[in-house]
Amino acid sequence: ALALTRQAQEIIRPDLKIIIMSATIDASAICEALQAPLIESEGRMFPVETIYSETDIARYDIYKEVAATILKAADKHEGDILAFLPGQSEILKCKEILDASLSRAAASSSASASLSAASSSAAELSVPQVYPLYGNLPPEKQRLAIAPSKEGERKIVLATPIAETSLTIEGVRIVVDSGLCRKLVYDARTGLSHLETVTISKDMATQRKGRAGRVAEGICYRLWTQTSEHLMED
């Protein structure tokens, strides 16, 4: 897209102004290549506490650990929760666990509370709503995931890396990071490309952590050890 825009500028529209915006791009390299000035806009960031896992989690179990961490965090802290998983499959499996667990918790709460309509309503409001968020999701369901929570409501968003920089989710104060993503890998032997689950870079981890500090002080649960973090690519 940038190459075509530059070509249009050179051939058709020499007066065309080009603005390149990104939260993750290597700005110095782009500025050098295009001979363009750099303008930085830094939003306000609140402190985010980082909590590491004591052990590394097996990839095939990552959705279970994400679900367990979300439930633990929801009991200990306030605010909406954003969890990063590598793909749609893990998101749907994690959502299934959370829906079942939260339904049991709601039923238990209702049974021990008064049977009055007011008490029942309060019990319903206390149960977080779980929303998936990935590229193939219909637009109307994506809007539900990113819409601000109403007063008295709380939500849990299970997302792919689409929520790192492309979308803003207001109200998030807790991030649960699986440390994984899907990456398109080329196989020279077959001449084909395929999606592979890989460990994220330190930059991606920083982007994800920052989502918890947009509106207030937050917490980021990283499902890997500090030792493993030293081995991650920059």
Which role does the model predict for each range below?
Residues 2-234:
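P-loop NTPase motor module signature
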